[in-house]
Curated annotation (Swiss-Prot):
Keywords associated with the record: Chloroplast, Cytochrome c-type biogenesis, Membrane, Plastid, Thylakoid, Transmembrane, Transmembrane helix
Keyword Transmembrane helix listed: yes
Cystines in this chain: none
Alphabetical list of HAMAP family matching this protein: CytC_Ccs1 (MF_01392)
Subunit relationships: May interact with CcsA.
Subcellular location, principal: plastid
Function: Required during biogenesis of c-type cytochromes (cytochrome c6 and cytochrome f) at the step of heme attachment.
The species this protein was found in: Heterosigma akashiwo (strain NIES-293 / 8280G21-1)
Annotated protein name in UniProt: Cytochrome c biogenesis protein Ccs1
Length: 423
């Protein structure tokens, strides 16, 4: 078992895993994820495969249509995590343990700086070493100093950070979900239209109410921003949280995040003879802008002289344009105004707001992992330096001082500059 862990702790093995994961993520970025089989058959046909090999059968066989949730990708992440753990225990911890020891030696090997001198200023040299931040230990006539032990400990936290990121990714793949909802103003809804989910996903039964929806426009009638006011409702029907969301300003409640994504018109509410009714609209586009069309009957369907008017809506400002049967603009009507002979009154635009709901149980692991990774990576670049001093007493009160120094980051020690005047 120990041999297996030593293989897992091998740097080449970890690099190979990272390469495989990188290639897999590249495929996940190129191939659209979580689409229907018909979509892949249409875009990745058997004839003329992309790159000479990529067809819908290959995608389906290797589960490339949901890479981040399939078993072999999660196995790669787990293998990398185990490799990092093995490397930490078999390589990092022994190195830290060795660095904490007082390693006294008269002639250490592979040093970056070495000199011998006859001097009576050994005490001054030792004080200089201490002033440089070294911890100095003495054993008879030998001195040993270390500095920057945090630089040897930091790689352990780098590994821990990456493991946290891997765990967060696995939790997100197994337990996260994504939902798209189109909800009318004033309605209460639950999460239903799930577009993607993991095998261990548990859908929240949280109730949400859309209190209001509105749009801000630029002077040229281009949409500036659209907003939805949402309320979180508890089991007793009480509001526990409320926030107005917009694009890039979501509502976060527990493990749910609500994003503003889209909007649409469903119809118009009209009043006729003190009775309200609704007429649906049909969406189309004009110059890449949304336009809605509908037809308002002005007589009953049983009338022989059935007539009506065409209504066009091109924004959410509360304005409609009425055209006659010849396609000529008849009038422009605002909300709460009468459409025809004070018999038909425009009451309300019936709109829906598009809400994307995400749950990611691994997001905190990923955030903390990246935070630790940034800090520990910076700390890992701190040099771990060692210095050895050996004192030999000569005749006539002279002292022979042997100085050796070593560092793991740079070949030029700042300490050598400080002790240069004594050499």
């Amino acid at each position: 078992m120990e041999k297996i862990f030593k293989i897992l702790a091998n740097l080449k093995f970890a690099i190979a895993l990272l390469l495989l994961i990188s290639i897999t993520i590249t495929f996940g970025s190129i191939i659209e994820q979580d689409q229907t089989l018909d979509y892949y058959k249409q875009n990745y046909p058997l004839t003329n495969p992309i790159g000479g090999f990529l067809t819908w059968k290959v995608i389906n066989m290797f589960q490339l249509n949901h890479i981040y949730k399939n078993f072999w990708f999660i196995s790669l992440l787990l293998s990398l995590g185990i490799s990092l753990i093995a490397c930490t225990f078999f390589q990092q911890f022994p190195g830290i343990k060795f660095s904490r020891r007082c390693y006294f030696s008269n002639n250490p090997r592979k040093t970056d700086f070495q000199t011998q001198l006859k001097t009576n200023l050994s005490r001054n040299i030792i004080y200089t070493i201490i002033s440089e931040g070294y911890f100095v230990f003495q054993q008879k006539k030998n001195f040993y100093g270390t500095k920057g032990i945090i630089g040897r400990i930091a790689p352990v936290f780098v590994h821990l950070s990456i493991i946290l990121i891997l765990l967060g990714s696995i939790f997100a793949s197994l337990g996260g979900f994504n939902s798209q909802e189109l909800i009318g103003k004033g309605e209460i809804f639950h999460i239903q239209n799930v577009t993607s989910s993991g095998p261990l996903t548990k859908l929240s039964q949280q109730a949400i109410r859309v209190n209001d929806f509105w749009i801000n426009y630029y002077p040229n009638n281009k949409i500036k921003q659209f907003y939805s006011n949402l309320s979180i409702i508890n089991g007793d029907g009480q509001e526990v949280r409320s926030k107005t969301i917009s694009v890039n300003k979501p509502l976060i409640y527990k493990d749910l995040t609500f994003y503003q994504t889209d909007w649409n018109l469903l119809g118009l509410r009209i009043s006729h003879n003190n009775k309200n009714f609704q007429i649906p609209v049909i969406q189309t586009t004009q110059n890449l802008n949304k336009v809605w069309l509908t037809w308002l009957p002005l007589e009953s369907n049983t009338s022989k002289n059935l007539s009506g008017e065409t209504i066009i809506i091109n924004n959410y400002k509360g304005t409609i344009y009425i055209y006659d049967n010849n396609g000529q603009l008849n009038k422009k009507i605002e909300l709460s105004n009468f459409i025809e002979n004070k018999n038909y009154k425009l009451i309300e635009f019936l709109s829906v707001t598009g809400i994307q709901i995400k749950s990611d149980p691994g997001i905190l692991f990923i955030y903390f992992g990246f935070g630790f990774l940034m800090v520990s990576t910076i700390l890992s670049y701190l040099s771990f330096s060692q210095v050895w001093l050996g004192i030999d007493y000569l005749e006539q009160n002279n002292i022979k001082l042997t100085v050796n120094a070593k560092t793991n980051r740079t070949k030029v020690l700042a300490l050598t500059v400080r002790i240069q005047p004594f050499l």
